[in-house]
Amino acid sequence: MKIANTFIKRGAAGGLDLSQAPGVTLTLAERRRSRQRLDLDEGRGELGMAIERGQTLRDGDVLVAEDGTYVVVRAALEDVARVTAATPWQLARAAYHLGNRHVLLEIAERHLQFEYDAVLIDMLAQLGGVTATRLRAVFEPDVGAYGGGHRHGHDESFGDDYALAQAAYHAHEAHPHAHSHAGGHGHVHSGHGHGGKHGEHDAES
């Protein structure tokens, strides 16, 4: 199994040829994890991810495997609440109250989005002038100022790191002389009989 230990932000990926690149569709929770095993879209194989901690992948970012293979990140549709208001002041007031509850919040010019929560919907209904609509949408909250979560040492993720390393080792040993690594490859190998679920993930707070 190939490992991606870096990625290119979507704003810097415009010059890349991604026409044949596989994709991987991830929820926000998955895009915030630095260590995991991914099932690529359309059954195009697996990829181990081991990027720098504290990063949040966004729709259109490009993971780069150790052999130079590109994998395009696609944000999954999620169950969110979209908040609109009659005036900018009322929208700002809604953002203030949601922020007081430490909610991950996506802030756009004319609306807010957060992970759907019926309790928060009821709270917003009491503000007046605010409408919250439940829908399925890409969710990309502003997490840049806070990083990817709070960590206390390496113990939380050691098991995941070790399992990922073991999976990569055994995948390589199963095909020790199948190809040369000198020139690199422009594709990701197909799956090796694993199930359709993602592997174990880091614990994020």
From Swiss-Prot:
One GO biological process term: protein folding
HAMAP family: UreE
Gene: ureE
Name of the featured protein: Urease accessory protein UreE
Top-rank lineage group of the source organism: Bacteria
Assigned GO CC terms: cytoplasm
Pfam families: UreE_C, UreE_N
Described function: Involved in urease metallocenter assembly. Binds nickel. Probably functions as a nickel donor during metallocenter assembly.
Keyword Cytoplasm belongs to the record: yes
Residue spans of biased composition, Basic residues class: 177-196
Compartments (UniProt record): Cytoplasm
